[in-house]
From Swiss-Prot:
The chain crosses the membrane at residues 172-192. GO terms for biological process: angiogenesis; apoptotic process; cholesterol homeostasis; exploration behavior; gene expression; homeostasis of number of cells within a tissue; inner ear auditory receptor cell differentiation; inner ear receptor cell differentiation. It is found in: Lysosome membrane; Endoplasmic reticulum membrane. Widely expressed in the cortex and Purkinje cells of cerebellum. Expressed in the inner ear, mainly in the hair cells, spiral ganglia, the spiral limbus, and the stria vascularis. Interacts with NOTCH2. Binds cholesterol and may regulate the distribution and homeostasis of cholesterol in hair cells. May play a role in angiogenesis. It comes from Mus musculus (Mouse). The modification Phosphoserine is found at S82. Keywords: Endoplasmic reticulum, Glycoprotein, Lysosome, Membrane, Phosphoprotein, Transmembrane, Transmembrane helix. GO terms for cellular component: endoplasmic reticulum; endoplasmic reticulum membrane; lysosomal membrane; stereocilium. This is Major intrinsically disordered NOTCH2-binding receptor 1-like homolog. The keyword Protease does not apply. Disruption phenotype: In an experimental Parkinson's disease model, homozygous knockout mice lacking Minar2 display severe motor deficits such as rigidity and bradykinesia, gait abnormalities, reduced spontaneous locomotor and exploratory behavior. Homozygous knockout mice lacking Minar2 present with rapidly progressive sensorineural hearing loss (HL) associated with a reduction in outer hair cell stereocilia in the shortest row and degeneration of hair cells at a later age.
Length: 193
């Protein structure tokens, strides 16, 4: 599959493994942006040229270079060091921040998946799978969940009243029928006796 790919279309065709990484080592600011930002430096104390650097890319290049000097092979994977304890929680909550211990834990979970509901409940963030399995999908409340529709309560109340009224009417008709049958039986028995 890799042999069929045309690597010349990649942005950095010398290193296809660095696809979609910024290859910015010294990107000069344009002269219009530089002149616009000169007003920020009072008294004319401003740097002659300003450079942008991709620090992640630069750090990787430096670690690979130091490993070459020390005699380590490039084939060994370069593992980033763990972040310092003083790292802010904002950075740790950033979705682009990847902690190696979390990634290793995820890989460990993938190697040994949970096949029972109890194991899934123990290891999962969503711990109520067994409760969801007990619910009946034929029940309307299963599909509605906690959704609220304005006016739905009043419609339900009207429907309940209508059902109750119809039940009472049926009971009244049955009682009337039973009473009329009893009256006819009593009258017929008195006439023929």
């Amino acid at each position: 599959m890799k042999g069929d790919m045309d690597l010349s279309v990649l942005p950095n065709n010398n290193h296809p493994d660095k696809f979609l990484q910024l290859d910015v080592k010294s990107l000069m600011r344009s002269s219009t942006l530089l002149q616009a930002s000169l007003a920020r430096f009072p008294g004319g104390n401003y740097p002659a040229t300003q450079h942008w650097q991709n620090l992640v890319y630069s750090q990787r290049e430096k670690t690979i270079a130091t490993q070459r000097i020390k005699g380590f092979g490039v084939e060994n994977p370069v593992l980033p060091e763990s972040p310092p304890a003083s790292m802010s929680s904002v950075m740790k909550n950033n979705p682009l921040y990847g902690d190696i211990t979390l990634e290793e834990a995820m890989e460990e979970r993938k190697k040994s998946p949970s096949w029972t509901i109890e194991e899934y409940d123990k290891h999962s963030v969503h711990t109520n799978l067994s409760g969801h399995l007990k619910e009946n999908p034929n029940d309307l409340r299963f599909w509605l969940g906690d959704t609220y529709t304005p006016g739905f309560d009043t419609l339900l109340k009207k429907k309940k009243k209508r059902n109750k009224r119809s039940k009472l009417c049926h009971m009244g008709l049955i009682l009337l029928l039973v009473a009329s049958i009893l009256v006819t039986i009593v009258t017929l028995s008195t006439i023929f006796s």
